[in-house]
Amino acid sequence: KHFSTTAPEKNLPVLLALIGIWYNNFFGAETEAILPYDQYMHRFAAYFQQGNMESNGKYVDRNGNAVDYQTGPIIWGEPGTNGQHAFYQLIHQGTKMVPCDFIAPAITQNPLSDHHPKLLSNFFAQTEALAFGKSREVVEQEYRDQGKDPAALEHVVPFKVFEGNRP
């Protein structure tokens, strides 16, 4: 009902579609990651992939005319914690811009009572890290606070710093 009755400027599906077009055509981001933080949504990325890529994966418009813009991103993803141990390094520190859609339910259907708060903790930590990054100064302070050898710092810092400002 939200999609069909809400004005475009407040319509979440419309806004997400426009952001996707913006990243694809103006930032050259040819891919988009869908990252659900609930195991019951483990196939959501594949579901969304099929709908988006099949609908938008054409080089012509609805009148059959060739277009001169990118028509859709490559959609992929995994449940959050699976992805954290697979491809998040590329998203945080890689050379490619990978816009990400993080999804988490307010109320989970998972019967493990402490599972959802832990997933939400990871969910918020990842989105914050992508938005704000971690500076050299923060990494150095963390090492000092942990009592680690300052001599090892120079070898480690480049691998712990990430810029943030990732969509």
Curated annotation (Swiss-Prot):
Keywords: Cytoplasm, Gluconeogenesis, Glycolysis, Isomerase
Gene3D superfamilies noted in UniProt: Glucose-6-phosphate isomerase like protein, domain 1 (3.40.50.10490)
Coiled coil: none
Active site: E54, H85
Molecular function terms, GO-annotated: carbohydrate derivative binding; glucose-6-phosphate isomerase activity; monosaccharide binding
Functional pathway: Carbohydrate biosynthesis; gluconeogenesis; Carbohydrate degradation; glycolysis; D-glyceraldehyde 3-phosphate and glycerone phosphate from D-glucose: step 2/4
A GO CC annotation given for this chain: cytosol
Main function: Catalyzes the reversible isomerization of glucose-6-phosphate to fructose-6-phosphate.
The protein's name: Glucose-6-phosphate isomerase
